[in-house]
């Protein structure tokens, strides 16, 4: 989507981000895919950012654990990474350039599922992008954990369609938060709106 809306001070816009990595060890593993989406506060999609597979050598992909090797082969990300010429710095700069059209620096929390892990990787491999976000996180997985504790039936309506690619994971996270928003009263024992 092209930028059609100017950044307005009163708008509450949310930046959704997802990364695919070679594993979960922030000191050893690496970001291999990044995508972003901007929504308004009502979770309406305003813009879809660039989606990048980040170049890595075959030996780094082969060093991944079995789950990651199988998943990234199945999703097609493996081949996209091998074919890519995009480096971390290019993906970071292009993502920031996109976000600057939609959201002011520091105005949006980092939004997504298990987003603390993504923030750790960004801090190490894309620090300028990590600093673009507010220090707060909007982590959908927190609501999932709370629903599991307080109102497990809410989880029945969560449907994941993602292929474990960054962009599809973002859309799953947005859909999941929409589902929880409909059930917010249930968390506190209030009637569902």
Swiss-Prot record:
Belongs to the oligoribonuclease family. Pfam families: RNase_T. It comes from the Bacteria. This is Oligoribonuclease. GO terms for molecular function: 3'-5'-RNA exonuclease activity; nucleic acid binding. The gene is orn. CDD domains: Orn (cd06135). It comes from Xylella fastidiosa (strain 9a5c). Its main location: cytoplasm. It is found in: Cytoplasm.
